[in-house]
Structures are given as C-alpha cells and as structure tokens.
Amino acid sequence: MDLSSLEIFRAVAHEASVTRAAQRLQRAQSNVTTRIRQLEEDLGVELFLRDGKRMSLTERGSEFLAYAEQLLALADEARQSMHPAEPGGRLRLGSMESTAASRLPALLASYHKACPRVALEVSTGTSHALFDGVRARRLDCALVAAGPGWAGELDGSGLRGEPLFREELLMILPAEHPPVHDVAEVRLRTLAGFARGCTYRQLAEDSLGTPLTVQEVGSYHAILACVAAGACVGVLPRSVLQLLGTPPLRSLPLAEVDTWLVWREGYATAAFERWRGVLGQAGD
C-alpha cells in the first residue's frame, strides 16, 4: 500500500467509476483497475461492489475511505510544511450554498491570484454535513452558519473556529400572502428548505413552530420558485436574494446569523493560513 494506491482508491470511490477516475487522474483505465485489485488483495477485503461499470463502496470500503482521506491529508500537510513560504498543494474547502453563491467567487479569485500553486477543491453542503466533513478530515476547513448553541459545538470537538460574516436571514412569502409584521402572522404551514442539518432551515422551523410540513429542495432557485408558486414560505440570506433577483415576493426579517470558518485544531498549512488571511480581510 502506498499513497498512489490511496489516491487511486479515493478517486474511484468519489467518482463511482473506474473510467471517470482514470480520466480525473490522467491514468490508463487498466492501470486503475489493476491498482484497485492489488489494494484489495493487500487488505484482504473487497472494497467495491461491481455493477457493470458502476463501482460502489462496500461497508469495509467506506471504513477504509475514512482512513485513506486522513492519510492523504496528512501527507499533503507534510509536503506543504516543507515549503511554508510558497503555498502549494491542495486545500479542500467546504461551504454552504448561500456563501458559495454570494461571497466565495470574489474571495476565490483573490486567493488564486495570491496562491496560484494551490489546488482548491470546493464542495457545498449543510452546516452539519460540513462540520462533520472537517472533523472526519474529508475537508480541511469549511464556512458554516452558527446556530443556537454554536459555541458549545466547538467545545471538545477537536475543531477551532472564528466568525467572518453576519448574514441577515429573511423569510420570504408569496406576493399574495397578506402583509405580515411577525412570524406569528404567517399563514402558510409549508416550508421550502434544504435537507436536515441546514442551520437556516432549523431557525425557520423553530420560528414557525408546529404543525409544519417541510418540502426539501436542492437550491435557492428552487426555494424561490416554490414560494413564488404560492404554496409555501422559504428562508434565505438577504445577500442571496439580492444576487439572484426575484419575482415579486414578500419578505420578513427572521434573524442575524454569523458565518464561521472552522478547521481542525493543529491544522496550519501555508495554503490554509493564506486563505484565513484572505477571509479576514473580507470580513473586516
């Protein structure tokens, strides 16, 4: 087992395909297949279930992926530590959809200009999923929303964090809904929102109370479309609403929520520290 084998295994696991993994790694497909087979023989377990061209992780494969991610992350940290004055290597950044849409583009452009040798990998998800991703070393750092009791979540988690931005969270309602001045006046009992683990959704659920039906969608465009259709309410930051532009809707201030940067305690590569600097300048 070597780092090259782990990189190949991770690529196949993420792509669920030998063909796509080979393209991503710029390797021959036969080489990828052989290396996966050799790794399985070395470990004495089956890592993948084969269904035609689709590759899905077995239970043991999922367990091994967590270790592979940690080993590869540590190896990358070790490489970067040898050249602290020249940020390079890889930085795996997690972000909420709202931050990725409204704030990240300009920040990533500034960072790439300052650190062109760093390969940035950006993925999006709910705050809960991103928090877990950093803790499990699938991500190096993440931008998450700080909900109620946030400070307590960091205690004993092995993670550190710092606040960056404050977002004004709005509840949006169909244009035909009667004017409201308080959440208690909202008549609709269906909420369009992201999957569980989204801090904004949780704040909306807590404010609206029960009974409440949640219609899970995958994007802010979908939330806006559902609300405009008149069947439900939604929540999103004002910055996203201004960015996307909307059909005529009503809006109601719901809360102010801080966006935090979180990372593993002790993680301090040159690439990450430069990223913290870019974020700090934007948050000032």
Swiss-Prot record:
Summary of the knockout phenotype: The PA1225 gene, encoding a quinone oxidoreductase, is the most highly up-regulated gene in cells lacking NmoR.
Gene3D superfamilies xref list: Periplasmic binding protein-like II, Winged helix-like DNA-binding domain superfamily/Winged helix DNA-binding domain
Superkingdom of source: Bacteria
DNA-binding region per UniProt: 18-37
Secreted found in the keyword field: no
Domain (HTH lysR-type) ranges: 1-58
InterPro entries the UniProt entry points to: LysR_subst-bd (IPR005119), Tscrpt_reg_HTH_LysR (IPR000847), WH-like_DNA-bd_sf (IPR036388), WH_DNA-bd_sf (IPR036390)
Key words of the record: DNA-binding, Repressor, Transcription, Transcription regulation
One Gene Ontology term from the biological process aspect of the record: regulation of DNA-templated transcription
GO MF terms, alphabetically ordered: DNA-binding transcription factor activity; transcription cis-regulatory region binding
Family, similarity comment: Belongs to the LysR transcriptional regulatory family.
Function summary: Represses its own transcription and the expression of nmoA, a nitronate monooxygenase. The nmoA-nmoR intergenic region is the sole direct binding site of NmoR across the P.aeruginosa PAO1 genome. Other genes seem also to be under negative control of NmoR, especially PA1225 and the hemO gene.
Protein's recorded name: HTH-type transcriptional regulator NmoR
Chain's gene name: nmoR
